[in-house]
């Protein structure tokens, strides 16, 4: 299930709420309720606290309504931490991933609090594992030290049509 958490990206290069909503919608249409849940929860480590504002778009309203009815469980936390450790070029330490996301989307008011929750979740799973999460991720030292430019969508031309 966790591998499908970003299935909303199937609609293209879109912002966080759009890919969350589209993943939820697609998974629901397929009858994949557990995948739909992960599509909704993986980008919101603060869960209910994430929505201390009134959303503008219909997609954001739907996400808020879902999250407010949702009780976070360990699987939600696990997918959130896995998502926070992965880039398109491999596993990285959390700080590297946080900078990567911030460079692409900008800083949002709730990011720092979300980072704190992510570190708490990391420590929670490390307690269960009896070791650092970083100890079990292949090549994390090498990929953390890579410095690729932030990912940008390809430029459309006569040969490429999304």
Q: Model segments located where?
A:
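Charged phosphate-binding loop/patch that engages nucleotide di/tri-phosphates or the phosphate backbone
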Residues: 107-162
């Amino acid at each position: 299930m966790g591998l499908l958490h970003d299935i909303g990206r199937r609609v293209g290069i879109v912002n966080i709420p759009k890919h969350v909503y589209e993943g939820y919608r697609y998974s629901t249409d397929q009858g994949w309720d557990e995948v739909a849940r992960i599509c909704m929860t993986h980008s919101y480590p603060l869960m209910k606290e994430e929505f201390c504002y009134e959303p503008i778009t219909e997609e954001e309203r739907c996400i808020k309504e879902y999250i407010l009815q949702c009780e976070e469980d360990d699987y939600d936390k696990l997918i959130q931490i896995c998502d926070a450790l992965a880039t398109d070029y491999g596993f990285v330490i959390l700080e590297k991933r946080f900078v990567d996301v911030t460079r692409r989307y900008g800083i949002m008011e709730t990011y720092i609090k979300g980072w704190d929750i992510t570190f708490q979740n990391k420590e929670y799973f490390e307690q269960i594992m009896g070791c650092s999460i970083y100890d079990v991720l292949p090549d994390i030292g090498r990929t953390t030290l890579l410095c690729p430019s932030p990912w940008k969508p390809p430029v459309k031309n006569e040969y490429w049509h999304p």
